[in-house]
Amino acid sequence: MTDSHRPDADDIPDDDELSTDFSNQFLLAMPGVVEGSLAGTVIYICEHTRRGALGLVINRPTDLTLATLFERIDLKLEIGPVKDEMVFFGGPVQTDRGFVLHAPAGDYTSSINLGELALTTSRDVLQAVADGNGPARMLVTLGYAGWGAGQLESEMAQNSWLSVGADSHIIFDVAPEDRYPAALKLLGVDPVMLAGGAGHA
């Protein structure tokens, strides 16, 4: 993985066709293959082009609440239960930077429209949340997971990840500890069978 890809709206990767495009897919880390901070993770792939890929871990909450995060950036969040929601570890790259995966897309300064969802990195989405008119559903992370050109394809060929079409219900409505098994159910995969087989469905 690499930190060479910077996810700004003015730096959206080119849309050259890929043989396999993992955008809007869940990647599930294969036990015993993916190690370190990404072991056991489910990653939602926001962008995947010839220049690389960018995703957010969706099942690794931190000890930081949204209220505390907002306080750190001089915003006051008093809306419950939003203020008690947890901030997630989004990946090992730029862990001091916030990323908001949300629905509906809305109109924010630095956003990438992902179809049903959007990824926003600008402060205005958090200001909207503080004002009580933010996105109806959101997941806030610090950091992201990034791959350089060809890296994700290589890792898939090495069976490092399982992939399946993303389901926003799992992102927003399923408890973090249940998101990995819930994503596995989309594949019809038994956890004990993960040691072998191809990296994608």
UniProtKB/Swiss-Prot annotation:
Intrachain disulfide bonds: none
Domain of life: Bacteria
GO cellular component: cytosol
InterPro entries documented for this protein: AlgH-like
Family, as annotated: Belongs to the UPF0301 (AlgH) family.
Protein name according to UniProt: UPF0301 protein BP0319
